[in-house]
C-alpha cells in the first residue's frame, strides 16, 4: 500500500504512439546507482511510444551507464553537465523545465534525495528540477538504496519532506539487492515506473 504522497505501481500503460506518452516531453534524471541499468528500458519504451525523452545524468550515473547508450535509445542529446549547450539564448535548465510534461528521477539515490530536499542545484539533474513548477508538472522520484539506507531516520525525514514539497515518491520494492541482502529499497521494475509516469501524466492533464 502506498503512503500519502507516494505512487504505487498500477496497471501497465498503453505505450503505442496513440497512448498516454505520445508527443509528451519527458525529462528523465539518472543518478549514480546500479539500478540505472533499468532506466535504459524505460527510456526505450518511452521513445517507442512517441515521447520526446531528454535524459539528464549526474557524473556518478555515467559510471554505471554511458551517455551514448541513452542517446541511442532516446534519439536525442543527453545532458551530463549544466555547462552543455551554453550557446543557447534560453538557459538550458529553464528551457527543459518549462517544456517538460513530466519528470522522473530514477534511480533516486539517498544522496540525491537529500540534495533535492535541501535545495541543491549543482548538477544538471538537480538544476533542472529546481526550475520545474511542480504545481503544473509532475515530478516523480524512484528511490533506490539498500535496506539500511532506506530505513535511516534521515532518509525517512527526507521522503516526508519531498512528499510535502509536492514530489511524487514511487514506493520501492522489497527484494534482492546489489549488496547481496534482501530488503526494502529496490527500485521498481521498468513496467512499474512507466505505469506511475502514465498515471501522473493522466492526473496532470487539464
Can you annotate each of these PLM segments?
Residues 1-141, 147-206:
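A cross-family phosphate/adenosyl-ligand binding-site feature
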Amino acid at each position: 500500500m502506498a503512503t500519502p504522497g507516494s505512487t504505487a505501481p498500477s496497471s501497465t500503460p498503453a505505450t503505442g504512439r496513440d497512448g498516454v506518452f505520445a508527443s509528451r516531453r519527458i525529462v528523465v534524471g539518472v543518478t549514480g546507482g546500479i539500478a540505472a541499468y533499468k532506466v535504459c528500458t524505460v527510456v526505450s519504451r518511452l521513445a517507442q511510444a512517441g515521447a520526446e525523452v531528454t535524459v539528464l545524468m549526474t557524473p556518478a550515473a555515467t559510471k554505471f551507464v554511458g551517455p551514448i547508450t541513452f542517446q541511442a535509445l532516446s534519439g536525442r542529446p543527453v545532458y551530463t553537465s549544466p555547462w552543455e549547450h551554453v550557446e543557447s539564448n534560453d538557459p538550458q535548465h529553464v528551457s527543459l523545465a518549462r517544456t517538460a510534461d513530466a519528470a522522473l528521477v530514477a534511480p533516486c539515490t539517498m544522496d540525491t534525495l537529500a540534495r533535492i530536499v535541501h535545495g541543491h542545484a549543482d548538477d544538471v539533474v538537480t538544476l533542472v528540477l529546481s526550475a520545474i513548477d511542480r504545481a503544473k508538472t509532475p515530478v516523480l522520484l524512484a528511490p533506490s538504496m539498500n535496506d539500511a539506507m532506506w530505513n535511516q531516520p534521515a532518509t525517512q525525514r527526507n521522503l516526508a519532506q519531498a512528499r510535502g514539497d509536492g514530489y511524487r515518491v514511487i514506493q520501492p520494492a522489497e527484494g534482492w539487492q546489489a549488496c547481496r541482502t534482501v530488503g526494502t529499497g529496490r527500485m521498481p521494475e521498468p513496467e512499474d515506473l512507466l505505469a506511475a509516469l502514465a498515471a501522473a501524466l493522466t492526473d496532470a492533464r487539464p
